[in-house]
């Protein structure tokens, strides 16, 4: 912690944002101790201290939002990438995902400490039907319950809007996700995009 805080002070920044991801439940208690210690060091040096977190789920409870809310100045909820690059389903971050993340966080952290991180990017998803062979290979796995193979690439806001125009598609409001949505067929599959505008 000393080196991180010293570097922040030397650089003249306002604070430190801690963003450790994919921490195992086994390491949770040690991570929370790091958060406590780094918080003390930041406050001793007049630095603001914030911690990034996934949307609260049972599998990441070891991040201990309640304790973070006590020791950190801000608890940031990364309310984006509901479905990530490797997901079986497409869609970036629906309004229900954002709302759920905020509501769960507010049960453990004071509202004046919560920051909801929202995306300034989206993903262009490409879906193709899986072959019978692929489905057979996936039998008995979660992947087998999805008939399409999905891939995606991240796009900035302007690039995302331009991809819809370039495809000759029209985005329409999707009431469920509360986002503009477009899809089109090309390259032997279906492109889908949810626009964060």
Spans of model-derived segments:
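Surface-exposed substrate-engagement region within the catalytic domains
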Residues: 67-82, 106-108, 119, 150-170
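Gly/Pro-rich active-site loop or hairpin
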Residues: 85-104, 184-196
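Glycan-binding loop/region signatures in secreted carbohydrate-active enzymes
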Residues: 122-197
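Glycine-rich loops and low-complexity Gly/Arg-rich segments
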Residues: 42, 74-78, 99-102, 139-145
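Helix N-cap and loop-to-helix transition residues
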Residues: 64, 94, 110, 155-156, ...
């Amino acid at each position: 912690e000393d080196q991180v805080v010293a570097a922040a002070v030397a650089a003249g920044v306002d604070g430190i944002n801690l963003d450790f991801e994919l921490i195992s439940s086994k390491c949770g208690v040690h991570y929370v101790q790091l958060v406590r210690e780094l918080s003390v060091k930041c406050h001793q040096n007049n630095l603001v201290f914030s911690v990034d977190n996934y949307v609260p789920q049972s599998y990441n409870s070891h991040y201990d939002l309640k304790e973070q809310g006590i020791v950190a100045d801000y608890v940031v909820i990364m309310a984006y990438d509901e479905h990530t690059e490797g997901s079986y389903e497409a869609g970036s971050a629906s309004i229900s995902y954002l709302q759920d993340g905020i509501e769960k966080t507010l049960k453990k952290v004071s509202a004046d400490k919560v920051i909801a991180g929202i995306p300034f990017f989206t993903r262009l998803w490409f879906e193709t039907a899986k072959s019978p062979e692929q489905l057979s290979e996936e039998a008995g796995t979660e992947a087998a319950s999805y008939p399409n193979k999905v891939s995606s690439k991240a796009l900035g806001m302007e690039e995302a809007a331009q991809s819809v125009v370039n495809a000759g598609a029209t985005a329409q409001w999707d009431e469920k996700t509360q986002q503009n949505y477009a899809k089109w067929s090309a390259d032997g599959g279906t492109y889908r995009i949810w626009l964060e505008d």
